[in-house]
């Protein structure tokens, strides 16, 4: 079975990528689906002054979960199971290594994000 990664930022283009994947799966191309949301690091002295590292990590996770909500809803409505991951880092430098790490055959993404 193919593995597909959808880097998802909540943009209209990212939603179109989810819709495209759904159409592929419904056309009988079974896939193991992985959603990925990458959060930019919070590296602000003002924030680090009032939040602990654990609080920043929890904030990143919460905001990542919120960002994935629309993709989750569409995949669940289509009956497609998936794995969701939230990572912190530079978006461009995080997607490809993550795809390699989990052994993805396809990366399905819009032409530009938010």
Where does each model-flagged region fall?
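Glycine-rich, Arg-bearing micro-motifs that act as flexible, cationic patches
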Residues: 109-114
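Small-residue (primarily alanine) positions within well-ordered alpha-helices
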Residues: 14-17, 71, 99
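Structural beta-alpha unit
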Residues: 73-107
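Short, hinge-like loop/turn segments at secondary-structure boundaries
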Residues: 51-54, 101-103
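Small/aliphatic-rich secondary-structure junction motif
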Residues: 1-51
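A short acidic, glycine-rich active-site loop
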Residues: 53-66
């Amino acid at each position: 079975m193919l593995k597909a990664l959808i880097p998802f930022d909540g943009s209209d283009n990212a939603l179109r990528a989810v819709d495209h994947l759904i159409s592929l799966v419904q056309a009988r191309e079974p896939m193991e689906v992985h959603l990925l949301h990458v959060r930019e690091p919070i590296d602000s002295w003002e924030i680090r002054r009032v939040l602990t590292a654990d609080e920043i990590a929890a904030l990143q996770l919460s905001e990542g979960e919120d960002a994935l909500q629309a993709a989750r809803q569409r995949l669940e409505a289509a009956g497609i199971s998936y794995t969701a991951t939230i990572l912190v880092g530079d978006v461009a430098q995080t997607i490809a290594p993550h795809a390699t790490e989990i052994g993805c055959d396809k990366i399905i993404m819009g032409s530009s994000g938010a």
